[in-house]
Curated annotation (Swiss-Prot):
HAMAP family in alphabetical order: IF_3
Protein name, as recorded: Translation initiation factor IF-3
Gene: infC
Compartments where located: Cytoplasm
Signal peptide: none
Record-stated family: Belongs to the IF-3 family.
Amino acid sequence: MYLFINIIRRNFISKNNFPKANREIRAREVRLVGENGEMHGVVNIRKALDMAERASLDLVEISPNAVPPVCKILDFGKFKYESKKRLHEARKKQKIVVLKEMKFKPNISIGDFETKLRKIKEFLKDGDKVKISLWFKGREILHKEVGQELFKRIEVGLEGPIKIDQHAKMEGKQMIMIVSPDIKV
């Protein structure tokens, strides 16, 4: 019973994202790269561990899928710190684009239309994509041309650099258009 639970538990443990180091490396031979980048060729794992120990550094598996695996002698703590720092910087630089939605009805009043249009402009100014959906109820769906006219009014009202990702099209009982800010980098 204990063995069965242990096998199941082992499958659900999250894997460490860092490479194997020192005694965790299971290969018998490795392609060794020295601490200054010099190649030592294919060596026995024990010899590689001894070389790393003499340098007071760690043996880290850089490329585990290579045959034999590529290992480098380096300071593992420093390597982990720099890896986390690079990952943090990459996440910091990436822009998360959010898809906002604005819902309209075919018989919307002018004041409501202008308010929703202003809100769409704010979303676009913040760099978000906007999904504009027009909901038809009952027999309103017979007058799709009203929806087309409304979307034309929206396009005209959205002055400035915008990009229409998806032109107005029907999806079930609603007409959808997706716009995003046209940012030239």
